[in-house]
């Protein structure tokens, strides 16, 4: 998994409806991603870089707020995030993905400018970076791998647009373009790619549908 810095400045609190979420609680919610699987307190603590006591207290609070689910396996407490509650998306996945995007942009400003053009194309619905650039293992010879979903019968038009950006930016894109309704079929047709998208993909456009496909529909 790509390592990201999850700890940010102190003093942040947000109010969502009737719930008040502290900075630490928000950081813990995002720490469940990208796997969104069960974790121990120690595993969560390693990701958020706070003391055991503070993490434990925040987890108890999140459990009371019904955002996190606590259960016991043997002598160990295990925690998981409830993917159906809106905070899992807004404070969890969104926050995690924003951090991924920011770290990518810092390293690859020119590539990001080109990706923005794909985002702004009215025919594109999802724009997802995958492959070596999303994993941080790219070389000078690496193409930029993008999945772009679009309206049916617009695949060739979108593919040609993405490839045309090479002339403007000097970047070799390797786009995979298909209609938006075909995205969920990746899970069955190419489970290795599906897992790579979940673990390493950077979603620049369409993160709400990506979250639904990968996390809610994948349960």
Language-model region placement:
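Short helix-loop-helix/strand-helix junction enriched in hydrophobic and basic residues
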Residues: 125-133
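A contiguous pocket-lining binding segment that forms or flanks enzyme active sites
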Residues: 147-149
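Catalytic core of pol beta-like nucleotidyltransferases
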Residues: 2-123, 135-141, 151-219
């Amino acid at each position: 998994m790509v390592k990201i810095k999850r700890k940010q400045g102190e003093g942040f609190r947000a109010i969502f409806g009737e719930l008040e979420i502290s900075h630490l609680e928000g950081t813990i919610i995002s720490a469940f991603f990208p796997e969104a699987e069960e974790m121990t307190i120690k595993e969560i603590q390693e990701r958020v870089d706070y003391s055991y006591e503070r993490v434990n207290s925040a987890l108890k609070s999140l459990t009371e707020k019904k955002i996190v689910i606590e259960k016991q396996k043997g002598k160990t407490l295990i925690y998981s995030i409830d993917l159906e509650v809106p905070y899992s998306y807004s404070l969890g996945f969104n926050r995690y993905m924003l951090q991924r995007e920011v770290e990518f942009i810092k390293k690859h400003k020119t590539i990001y400018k080109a990706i923005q053009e794909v985002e702004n194309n009215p025919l594109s619905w999802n724009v997802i970076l995958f492959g070596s650039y999303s994993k941080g293992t790219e070389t000078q010879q690496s193409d930029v791998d993008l999945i772009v979903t679009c309206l049916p019968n617009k695949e060739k038009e979108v593919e040609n647009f993405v490839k045309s950006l090479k002339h403007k930016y000097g970047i070799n894109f390797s786009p995979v373009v298909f209609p938006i309704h075909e995205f969920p079929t990746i899970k069955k047709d190419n489970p290795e790619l599906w897992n790579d998208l979940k673990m390493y993909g950077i979603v620049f456009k369409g993160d709400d549908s990506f979250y639904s496909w990968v996390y809610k529909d994948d349960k």
